[in-house]
Amino acid sequence: MINLRKTHPLMKIINNSFIDLPAPSNITSWWNFGSLLGICLIIQILTGLFLAMHYTSDTMTAFSSVTHICRDVNYGWLIRYLHANGASMFFICLFLHVGRGLYYGSYMFLETWNIGVLLLFAVMATAFMGYVLPWGQMSFWGATVITNLLSAIPYIGSDLVQWIWGGFSVDKATLTRFFAFHFILPFIIAALAGVHLLFLHETGSNNPIGISSDADKIPFHPYYTIKDILGMLLLILILMTLVLFSPDLLGDPDNYTPANPLNTPPHIKPEWYFLFAYAILRSIPNKLGGVLALIMSILILAIIPLLHTSKQRSLTFRPISQCLFWILVADLVTLTWIGGQPVEHPFIIIGQLASILYFFLILILMPITSLLENNLLKW
């Protein structure tokens, strides 16, 4: 009998991607986050679709429509908080996925890595626009502050800002277009994720020791399907705990106040997952310089393959580089904390030092340390 799974044009693609895919036998739980990101994206698209059925993208009714979803729609509160906290889980998985890539040298798969960086930008853009939709105080002022950063671009800056706003301030036109973009982007992300996977399967997965695993492969199913299901259950457990016990833990209380252009909140800050980049932006006194540093803080990921000077791919057997990697992680946690603090002493200087350390570690210290470790191999 012909095995339909291996011959049917559609099922063949699924089979070669998720069933008969040869996978390294030693990949750890750090390799689970790709599938978890897929689950997060599905959760976000489904909950977002149901929210869009009841949401109105008009400045007069947006805030009320979100309240209506929470109070009057069947399980509307659940859908809304799953969507809001699902975004946080998405970013936790994203940061861990990128961190895994940095630690184990997965960035040496250039196409996969660069599409991943593109995906990160797309997810960040989607999350930013989604935060504007409830039309609370932080939505309005966050949109105003972040879009205003484009005015730092010489010559065309102010025209560009007004073009994005669709007027002379963040208003009805801005909200409507942000809703449209927020709706379409997840589908673009899904398509990009497919391309990301396509390029990954051209080379096969990396593994913790960073050497070729061609000599020792196992089928993806059942070994890694079971492993991914375990990760998925843990993800859903954490997400549901967050949603059912403290749904507003990661949100901002200011967003429960309807948007008011005449009243500025005491501290304008984005969602927690943008705070590290926001801290880098704020630590530079010059507007254009701050914007460039903000963009570079993420775009620096694209040049990491060029900074790889080590003879070994992963950090598994490089203790000095491991120390620097964990210092970088601690630095990012510090930046996240600083981003949520008011602009006053001592937070300003801590933010500036943490920002300098961030770029210094990635651009100078880590490549030099890799060269040092190459020499240590000769001893």
Swiss-Prot record:
Record-level GO BP terms: mitochondrial electron transport, ubiquinol to cytochrome c
Cofactor: heme b
Domain of life: Eukaryota
Record-level GO cellular component terms: mitochondrial inner membrane; respiratory chain complex III
Keywords: Electron transport, Heme, Iron, Membrane, Metal-binding, Mitochondrion, Mitochondrion inner membrane, Respiratory chain, Transmembrane, Transmembrane helix, Transport, Ubiquinone
Mode of membrane association: Multi-pass membrane protein
Binding sites annotated in the UniProt record for heme b b562: H83, H182
Subunit structure and binding partners: The cytochrome bc1 complex contains 11 subunits: 3 respiratory subunits (MT-CYB, CYC1 and UQCRFS1), 2 core proteins (UQCRC1 and UQCRC2) and 6 low-molecular weight proteins (UQCRH/QCR6, UQCRB/QCR7, UQCRQ/QCR8, UQCR10/QCR9, UQCR11/QCR10 and a cleavage product of UQCRFS1). This cytochrome bc1 complex then forms a dimer.
Function recorded in the entry: Component of the ubiquinol-cytochrome c reductase complex (complex III or cytochrome b-c1 complex) that is part of the mitochondrial respiratory chain. The b-c1 complex mediates electron transfer from ubiquinol to cytochrome c. Contributes to the generation of a proton gradient across the mitochondrial membrane that is then used for ATP synthesis.
Other comments on record: Heme 1 (or BL or b562) is low-potential and absorbs at about 562 nm, and heme 2 (or BH or b566) is high-potential and absorbs at about 566 nm.
Protein name (record): Cytochrome b
Gene giving rise to this polypeptide: MT-CYB
